[in-house]
UniProtKB/Swiss-Prot annotation:
NCBIfam families per UniProt: PRK05461.1 (NF003967)
GO BP of this protein: error-free translesion synthesis
Domain ApaG: 1-125
Protein name: Protein ApaG
Record-linked Pfam families: DUF525
Lineage, highest ranks first: Bacteria, Pseudomonadati, Pseudomonadota, Gammaproteobacteria, Enterobacterales
Amino acid sequence: MINSPRVCIQVQSVYIEAQSSPDDERYVFAYTVTIRNLGRAPVQLLGRYWLITNGHGRETEVQGKGVVGVQPRIAPGEEYQYTGGAVIETPLGTMQGHYEMIDENGDAFTIDIPVFRLAVPTLIH
């Protein structure tokens, strides 16, 4: 979890066994992000950047406008939650990144998303 003066980000990831195929080096993960506005004014998420790293150190960058097709506006005290997915070639990897946001005055700010793990549950003890 990371906090800024205005925004709190929480991420949870889960392995999707039914969509994965280890024999084909295809490991599918879902991640759910909760974005809470802790400030006194609305904020809007405009863009995202992800750095996805597989267990061999191979990096993939993903960036774009909004999340899951929207640029949510989050009122004070409210939260926005969405679920995304990632496919990697190894049973263990990581994701990290940032969100590009604006406040009610149109001033831009960035919220970092710390590294979180993508892992097949049997690998973690």
